[in-house]
């Protein structure tokens, strides 16, 4: 019997043995930095002349790996391989597919610190953030395997006398998984295994900033018994390979995590029916947020300040769930703002390989430039309280930045920055605070810090986000505990790590027999 699901515990790095184990993980990764990695198509390793170079964002001169780069011809080969594999993979027993996930989770668990150390190097994640990313990858495998076992026999429906009706789920076809760089293990693994365990075949196009961890995960799935051709690893340009696969008539669904603009582009392209296409493509998209923490006048203000700082600056604000806006009632505004500034000044920014670092670099030059531009906009729109400096001489480092006294419609209150920047605005009362909280085109996460039960219940009904948290920060959703996904321009309302997520990768079939 399968044990009930429990989320993977986070590592306590105050325990010396855990600290040493993580340091060993860093040594393991250091030893294989700079290697070349192939595409994987039908189990075959394919090297290309053209490469994607993955660098350490904390040290631009350090190459994490050089990864083969797919073009249209190789993408077509991968599509044909996945399409052929679907014919038999879709007929495999759900129990077999679930067992592959259970085994893959066990392999990653044994190599946990190595994977986390790779995230430190490739994504610039500090220890705790990297450890949480790896734990979440394990959680997705454990949770989705169990969910598939629950769904494998379908759902009972009514039958009339002399009639038997069965309602069950079948796979869709070939899925294109386009994964992000900010959770390059967790989200990449979760979106991939959700498609695989439901009986689909996959073309995996990981983010160009973090392709090495995706290759290492493909190796894990192979070791766990995933047959050749079921998962094909094809990093490449979004404009060339991404568009080609989104448009392809044999693509059945696209699972995308990334920016609003790219998500909209994929959604538009996927809607077009191409010659030879015999279905309407399904799009599963998670597209970002502009997330607000509301601080009520009846609130634990220290809890509010701690929650804001952790949610705004964890992983340098590079989470779609990050707090980038604070709406505080005018009665407590100055107190909360001043305490947040105090706490922000205490944060250690630097090399994520050092355990004491709270905040590492941002992902690349393009992100650095964009965030610094938004900081300049913020200086025009509001009052800079702390931070605002950047240094891209060695890596892409930006100081945690707090702006005050913003108009709720200011650009840095409306547009996703995806960096260590948080903006404060005042509300007259709680209704006004909720009105501001709902005034963006997004609807992903939010939090309310309040001791007023009436106001919390009001927020439960009126704060229009997919993940709403009371008296805590707005980041850190745990698989199976906080199904994750938002409204409006935050995506297609899907809930990763929730009980209905796998259904997005299947279609329901009814069979009725008369006797």
UniProtKB/Swiss-Prot annotation:
It catalyses: L-glutamate 5-semialdehyde + NAD(+) + H2O = L-glutamate + NADH + 2 H(+). One of its GO terms (biological process) is proline catabolic process to glutamate. The keyword Transmembrane helix does not apply. One of its GO terms (cellular component) is cytoplasmic side of plasma membrane. GO terms for molecular function: 1-pyrroline-5-carboxylate dehydrogenase activity. The active site is at residues 286, 320. Pathway: Amino-acid degradation; L-proline degradation into L-glutamate; L-glutamate from L-proline: step 2/2. It comes from the Bacteria. CDD domains: ALDH_PutA-P5CDH-RocA. Keywords: NAD, Oxidoreductase. Its EC number is 1.2.1.88. InterPro entries: Ald_DH/histidinol_DH (IPR016161), Ald_DH_C (IPR016163), Ald_DH_CS_CYS (IPR016160), Ald_DH_CS_GLU (IPR029510), Ald_DH_N (IPR016162), Aldehyde_DH_dom (IPR015590), Proline_metab_enzyme (IPR050485), RocA (IPR005932). Belongs to the aldehyde dehydrogenase family. RocA subfamily. HAMAP family: RocA (MF_00733). This is 1-pyrroline-5-carboxylate dehydrogenase. It comes from Anoxybacillus flavithermus (strain DSM 21510 / WK1). The lineage of its organism: Bacteria, Bacillati, Bacillota, Bacilli, Bacillales.
């Amino acid at each position: 019997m399968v044990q009930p699901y429990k989320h993977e515990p986070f590592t306590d790095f105050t325990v010396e043995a855990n600290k040493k184990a993580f340091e060993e993980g860093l040594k393991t990764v250091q030893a294989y930095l700079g290697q070349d990695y192939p595409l994987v198509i039908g189990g075959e390793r394919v090297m290309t002349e053209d490469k994607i170079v993955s660098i350490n964002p904390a040290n631009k001169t350090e190459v994490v790996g050089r990864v083969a780069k797919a073009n249209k011809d190789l993408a077509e080969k991968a599509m044909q391989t996945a399409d052929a594999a679907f014919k038999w993979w879709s007929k495999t027993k759900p129990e077999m597919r679930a067992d592959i996930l259970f085994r893959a989770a066990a392999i990653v668990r044994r190599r946990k610190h190595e994977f986390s150390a790779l995230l430190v190097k490739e994504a610039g994640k500090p220890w705790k953030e990297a450890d949480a990313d790896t734990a979440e990858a394990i959680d997705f495998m454990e949770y989705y395997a169990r969910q598939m076992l629950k769904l494998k026999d379908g759902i009972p429906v009514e039958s009339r006398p002399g009639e038997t009706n069965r309602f069950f789920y079948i796979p869709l076809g070939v899925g294109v998984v386009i994964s992000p760089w900010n959770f390059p293990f967790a989200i990449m693994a979760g979106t991939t295994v959700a498609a695989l365990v439901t009986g689909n075949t996959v073309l995996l196009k990981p983010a160009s900033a973090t392709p090495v961890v995706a290759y290492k995960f493909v190796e894990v799935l192979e070791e766990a018994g995933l047959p050749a051709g079921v998962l094909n690893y094809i990093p490449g340009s979004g404009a060339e390979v991404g568009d080609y696969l989104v448009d392809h008539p044999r693509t059945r669904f696209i699972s995308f995590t990334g920016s609003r603009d790219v998500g909209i582009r994929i959604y538009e392209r996927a809607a077009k029916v191409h010659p030879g296409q015999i279905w309407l493509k399904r799009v599963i998209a998670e597209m970002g947020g502009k997330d607000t923490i509301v601080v009520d006048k009846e609130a634990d203000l220290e809890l509010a300040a701690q929650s804001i700082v952790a949610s705004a600056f964890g992983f340098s604000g590079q989470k779609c769930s990050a707090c980038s806006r604070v709406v505080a009632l005018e009665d407590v505004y100055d107190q909360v703002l001043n305490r947040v500034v105090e706490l922000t000044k205490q944060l250690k920014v630097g090399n994520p390989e050092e355990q004491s670092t709270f905040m590492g670099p941002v992902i690349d030059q393009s992100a650095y430039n964009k965030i610094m531009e938004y900081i300049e906009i913020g200086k025009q729109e509001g009052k800079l309280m702390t931070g605002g400096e950047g240094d891209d001489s060695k890596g892409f480092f930006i100081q945690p930045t707090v702006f005050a006294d913003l108009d709720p419609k200011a650009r840095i209150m409306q547009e996703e920055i995806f960096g260590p920047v948080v903006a404060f605005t005042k509300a007259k009362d709680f209704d006004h605070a909720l009105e501001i909280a709902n005034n963006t085109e997004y609807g992903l996460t939010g939090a309310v810090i309040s001791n007023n039960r009436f106001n919390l219940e009001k927020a439960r009904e009126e704060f229009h986000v997919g993940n709403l948290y009371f008296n805590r920060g707005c980041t850190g959703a745990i698989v199976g505990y906080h199904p994750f996904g938002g409204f409006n321009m935050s995506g297609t309302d899907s809930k990763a790590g929730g009980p209905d997520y796998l259904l997005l990768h299947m279609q329901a079939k009814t069979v009725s027999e008369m006797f």
